Amino acid sequence: MSWKMALQIPGGFWAAAVTVMLVMLSTPVAEARDFPKDFLVQFKGMCYFTNGTERVRGVARYIYNREEYGRFDSDVGEFQAVTELGRSIEDWNNYKDFLEQERAAVDKVCRHNYEAELRTTLQRQVEPTVTISPSRTEALNHHNLLVCSVTDFYPAQIKVRWFRNDQEETAGVVSTSLIRNGDWTFQILVMLEITPQRGDIYTCQVEHPSLQSPITVEWRAQSESAQSKMLSGIGGFVLGLIFLGLGLIIRHRGQKGPRGPPPAGLLH
């Protein structure tokens, strides 16, 4: 796997980069140009990694007004001119100490930063939350769509599978692409087309690096009568709670009321 990151460069390397840019812009080639009053000079350092730090490549790019004029590529090991303006950058290859410093940046900067990132971003893991819901309420033997929502996980690698009665379902599975939440976590929806039969059990199984074992969430197909009974039971339970609450309120108010005849003075 290849990976790329921007350099976090120690002060010494920044100083070297600024020195190179200033020298480039003060050469005869640069002095012959008609520089505008306002211009932009940039240094961009990038590290490229393959299989961790098995292979590391560092590239330092020197840019004037968004045009790269010179670079140092660790695979080449020397400064190279990209345009006429950067022609004199190759003179820096004669300064052996400075050249060795640039070559050493692969270890001192790239590999160093990789280890630092590995302890924070690269090893960060957040377990996913998994829920199942039908797209609509339908009776048995009617076409429907089950949605497995997998949310708030990191890193992005994830595997979501559907099962019907312990048998994996591959036909009728549709998935969204990974969705970035903007807080370094992801979410994904994996849908399964179904025609549920009485007693069917559908399972969404999720595998992720943050998990010791897969998460499994079940959804059971129910007949209309079973759903009605369940809803009736829930409704009865809620009504019971309401009447119980009203009874307690009435009793509480009754306890606060007068318990004997009012004082005689209040009758006149």
Swiss-Prot record:
GO terms for biological process: adaptive immune response; antigen processing and presentation of exogenous peptide antigen via MHC class II; immune response; peptide antigen assembly with MHC class II protein complex; positive regulation of immune response; positive regulation of T cell activation. Disulfide bonds join C47-C110, C148-C204. Glycans are attached at N51. Its main location: membrane. Keywords: Adaptive immunity, Cell membrane, Disulfide bond, Endoplasmic reticulum, Endosome, Glycoprotein, Golgi apparatus, Immunity, Lysosome, Membrane, MHC II, Signal, Transmembrane, Transmembrane helix. It comes from the Eukaryota. Belongs to the MHC class II family. This is HLA class II histocompatibility antigen, DQ beta 2 chain. It comes from Homo sapiens (Human). The lineage of its organism: Eukaryota, Metazoa, Chordata, Craniata, Vertebrata.
